[in-house]
Amino acid sequence: MKITINQASEFVGKEVTIGAWLANKRSSGKIAFLQLRDGTGFMQGVVVKAEVGDDMFATAKALTQETSLFVTGTINEDTRSPFGYEMAVSGVEVISESHDYPITPKEHGTEFLMDHRHLWLRSNRQHAIMKIRNEIIRASYEFFNKEGFLKIDPPILTGSAPEGTTELFHTKYFDEDAFLSQSGQLYMEAAAMAFGKVFSFGPTFRAEKSKTRRHLIEFWMIEPEMAFYKLEDSLQVQENYVAFLVKAVLDNCRLELDRLGRDVSHLEKMVAPFPRITYTEAIERLHELGFDDIVWGDDFGAPHETAIADSFEKPVFITHYPKAIKPFYMPEDPENDQVVLCADMIAPEGYGEIIGGSERIHDLETLQARMEDFDLDQEAYSWYLDLARYGSVPHSGFGLGLERTVAWISGTEHVRETIPFPRLLNRLYP
């Protein structure tokens, strides 16, 4: 019977066949140990010469790294094994031999591994990170479906930039100009006026010339929008959502976290509510900590975010940023017209901002005035202005960056490892 490695517990004591790749191999005299990988997990196969005969043992000893094969044997429970089960091998059938596999068990440099990203994905570490990424995506759908959100797919090709920035990828759309989307937010606002609570999940593109461990050129975002929600309502959704994601990974990816050496004691503290401080309070706190390179009105850099987050064990919301450094669609605070009703969620342990969100302006005249301040072409945004013309309501939304969230929860230092094929400033291959 053919099974997959993750089904091993159901077949203890039975002879089965597994299609797999040879991740690694070692031998000791008359015993060979095969580390097998099939995409669902890892398992050790034990080949004993006295039990399989000279020819089969010679075949097993000659196997090369990443050779594909069918392995037949009996599944045994083994508490000493890191995978919980192993196979007493009785037969090996080679499907396709692998010659001179470039990623050997020795240490390799980052550039070499990135050049061979299509093969690096096969490693134990990358397998663990991708499993955690998958769990965060799965849990996101579960959370928003349970909360009554409708999944909406905004376009990737757009005729305008949602935040009025210049960090856009330009392309021709027949005889017109088009851009790769930086965010689906404006379209999600339109959907919220139709369906109340909506969310999207898809790729976004930023032509930023940034070379930090937190930045990708192409990354994925979860973007919810909620009609009739004020800022505080949105913050409660955000903290419940992030706490839900962390618990899902703790519940369903414990083996992967262990494989990555993640200290889960930090993650076990991620229970809502999360602390909140204003931008002004954050600036004051930074000055108390000795930062003299930032004044009120400046945006935070990575060292500033890390210093603020270090004061808390959970993610922290920084609210009410200066109006001048935030996008046009954020409304002023009624009590202070120099700041807007917004918040960024800063993850602990130096991982920085993972969520940005705000209330949205729903008054037509206010929105038009803000667009003038930003020198935006109102004709290009006429459809968006229609939302304020025809029965708009107070509404809020946010965007969560998937790769930064995966990096934080998995304890991965650089976001390039949190997406299967990263697009970086100087990397478009493979």
Curated annotation (Swiss-Prot):
Domain of life of the source: Bacteria
Keywords on record: Aminoacyl-tRNA synthetase, ATP-binding, Cytoplasm, Ligase, Nucleotide-binding, Protein biosynthesis
Extract the Pfam families matched here: tRNA-synt_2 (PF00152), tRNA_anti-codon (PF01336)
PROSITE patterns, per database record: AA_TRNA_LIGASE_II (PS50862)
One record GO biological process? asparaginyl-tRNA aminoacylation
The reply on keyword Cell division is: no
Origin species, per record, is Listeria innocua serovar 6a (strain ATCC BAA-680 / CLIP 11262)
Assembly with partners or alone: Homodimer.
Family to which the UniProt record says this protein belongs: Belongs to the class-II aminoacyl-tRNA synthetase family.
**Where in the cell does this protein reside?**
Cytoplasm
Name the Gene Ontology molecular function terms of this record.
asparagine-tRNA ligase activity; ATP binding; catalytic activity, acting on a protein; nucleic acid binding; transferase activity
For the protein in the UniProt heading, the enzyme class is ligase
**Aminoacyl-tRNA synthetase among keywords:** yes
**Alphabetical list of InterPro entries matching this protein:** Aa-tRNA-synt_II, aa-tRNA-synth_II, aa-tRNA-synth_II/BPL/LPL, Asn-tRNA-ligase, Asp/Asn-tRNA-synth_IIb, NA-bd_OB-fold, NA-bd_OB_tRNA
From the broadest rank down, the organism's phylogenetic lineage runs: Bacteria, Bacillati, Bacillota, Bacilli, Bacillales
- Where does it sit, as one GO cellular component term? cytoplasm
Annotated catalysed reactions: tRNA(Asn) + L-asparagine + ATP = L-asparaginyl-tRNA(Asn) + AMP + diphosphate + H(+)
EC number(s) given by UniProt = 6.1.1.22
Q: What is this protein called?
A: Asparagine--tRNA ligase
